[in-house]
Regions:
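Helix-biased detector of long, well-ordered alpha-helical tracts
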Residues: 1-179
Length: 179
């Protein structure tokens, strides 16, 4: 989510601080987490520059800092009347994956795996955010849901919007569930 927030501002992520508490005997979990963290950090050029660790119930806090040229940050408050509203990727897969994991819905094995992956390993669109710097008037990460997050953008920008829900890109798994 931190990387997606950076992407939504057109910022280049650079540094990370990780603070955490881990219980004794959590070595396998820590090894898997570390592999994932370093793979994602390496993919986006982020260096882990500090933090703190202690023993206790598992609790992690990751902070990412980055760079954007002065005056070039893309803010939620920049939308203007007449702007188009775009999304990247399909929406709803993480929510559907969580519902399947919690037993609130059923999915076939392939759809369950794909949607769970979108929940557990979201794809930050850092390159897209950088490419849209100077082009987009406003951006935000919609990981909290399209309706709520677009509402934040509209409120901050003092504009309204008409959203054609039929045009929102969805995965086949979500389309089948909605049918």
């Amino acid at each position: 989510v931190n990387l997606s927030d950076m992407a939504a501002m057109g910022a280049r992520p650079r540094w990370a601080l990780l603070a955490g508490a881990l219980p004794d005997g959590d070595d396998a979990w820590l090894a898997a987490f570390s592999r994932g963290l370093y793979a994602l950090a390496g993919e986006h050029g982020v260096e882990l520059v500090g933090g703190d660790t202690t023993r206790g119930p598992r609790n992690l806090c990751l902070t990412i800092a980055g760079e954007v040229p002065a005056g070039a940050a893309i803010l939620r408050s920049g939308a203007r009347a007449g702007d188009d509203l775009w999304v990247s990727g399909t929406l709803g897969d993480a929510m559907l994956g969580l519902a399947a994991i919690e037993g609130r819905t059923s999915l076939d094995a392939a759809a369950r795996a794909a949607c769970a992956a979108r929940l557990e390993r979201p794809t930050p669109r850092v390159a897209l955010g950088l490419a849209l710097r100077g082009v987009a008037s406003a951006m935000l990460d919609v990981s909290d849901g399209l309706t709520g997050d677009v509402g934040h953008l509209l409120e901050r920008s003092s504009v309204g919007a008409v959203v054609d829900l039929a045009a929102v890109p969805r995965s086949g798994a979500l389309d089948r569930k909605l049918a």
